[in-house]
């Protein structure tokens, strides 16, 4: 499968989305997020298992995984999408050392364009931990609207997460 090149509007940045392969999954699996963000370390395990068992592109639940490169940096993030009944649920991960560098919004918008071109959905949705205000700010700027909250426990600690949606 060919690499999909996308250029962030108004920037010199060039994002490339490619089907997730084993090398990318292993590299992303080694990322370590600090503090309470460490809960996102676990989120990469299904990605690794999926690529080991089924090869690139998708897992058994129909989630498509992409490795994202930027300019000469071969792996700045992971992006997932799952199409269900007119909605595409996305997952967005940025390499820990790149957080806070104003990459989130252009990266997210380009990922949404890829999902829109692939599935022609009516809506996009995502789930985010409520403590992750940096991500929530990016998602809000991209037009996502906060929705229902759900509680969960990770390593004995209580968290809330919310689903956010926006029209495609």
Predicted features and spans:
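Conserved N-terminal entry element of GNAT/NAT acetyltransferase domains
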Residues: 1-26, 30, 168
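Short secondary-structure boundary/capping segments
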Residues: 6-9, 56-58, 79-80, 153-154
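Conserved glycine-rich acetyl-CoA-binding loop
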Residues: 92-109, 129-137, 141
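C-terminal "cap" of GNAT-fold acetyltransferases
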Residues: 121-136, 141-168
